[in-house]
Amino acid sequence: QEKILQSTRRGVASLMSSAAIGKLLNFTANVLITRSIGRKVLGTGSLRLDDLLFLGPLVLTREGLRRAAYRSNASNVNTQQSLVNLTWLVAPVTVLFALLFAYGMYIWPPVDITKDDTKDVNVGLAEYHRAMLYTGLAVLLAVLTEPVFVLAQSQLRTGLRAKIEMFAVLGKCLTMLYLTVYLNMSIEAFAIANITYAFIPLCSYWCFFICIDKQFPRPKPLQPQEPGHREEQWCTQEMRSTATVFWWQSLQKWLLENGEKIVLAFVGTTSQQGVYVVVDRLGSIVVRLLFQPAEEMSLATLGKL
C-alpha cells in the first residue's frame, strides 16, 4: 500500500506538471494561431474536428477501459491479458463510432450565416472534407495505441505517460503553428496536428514495451486456471463487468460535458463556434490543471488499495 501511495503522489505531480506545460503550450499556440486564421476556422477545427470527430469516438469507447485498468491487478497475467484483449475488441467499435460521427458532419456541414466580416474567412467545403479524412486517420492511430496505453496505466507508469503526453502536445502545437502561420493552411491544419498528436504516443508506447519491456501486447486466450481446462477464455468476468460499468459512466459523462458542443456544432454558425471555443478554453484551464490529475490518481489509488 505504501508503494501505491508513493506512486500516486509521484503520479499527481507528474500529471500536473505535464498538464501545466501542455496548457501553456496550447495557450501560446492558440494566441498565435488565432491571428492567422479567423473565428470560423477556429470554431470548426476545434469544435467539430478536435472535440467531436477526434476525441468523441475515443472517449466514448476507451475511457471505461482506462478506468478499469486502474483497478486491475498488474501482477496477474490473465488480468493484464484481459485488458489487452478488450482494447483490441473495442478498436472496431471506435472506428464505427468515428464513421457515424463523420457521416453526421458530412450531411450537416458547417453553417455560415454571418458573412459580413470580410477578414473572417469562411470554411471551404473541400478542405473540410479532406480534414475529416485526416482526422479519421488520427483516430485510427490513437486506437492502435490503446493496448500499450492500458498496460502502462495498469502498472501506474505515470512518469512515462506524462513525458509522452508533453511531447505529443508539443508536436501538435508546433505542427499547428507551422501549417497555419508559415504555410497559411486553415482547417486542414487541425486534422494534421491531430495526426501528429496521435502518432507520437503510438511510436513511444510501442517502442517502450517492445524494446525496453520486451513484450508485444497482442490478443490471445487467457491461461487456464485449472489443469486440463480446455475452454478458451479471452476476458475474465470481473474485468468485463468492471469495464461495462465504467463505459456506461463515461457515456453519461461525455454527453453531459459535450451536449452543448454537439448542439452548437450542428445548429450554430462557425463564427459562434469560434467565440465559444475561445471562452471554453480559457474558462476551464484551472480545472484541467488542478482537479483532473488529482481526480484521475485518486481513482487509481482507490482501485489499487
Task: Put a short name on every predicted segment.
Residues T87-V90, E146-V169, L255-E257, V277-D280, ...:
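Substrate-agnostic recognition of the 12-TM MFS/MFS-like secondary transporter fold
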Residues R35, R71, S154, T180-V181, ...:
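Transmembrane helix-loop junction
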Residues V59-V77, S154, G283-L305:
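Helix-loop junctions and terminal segments of transmembrane helices
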Residues Q1-T28, G43, R66-R67, A74, ...:
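N-terminal membrane topogenesis motif
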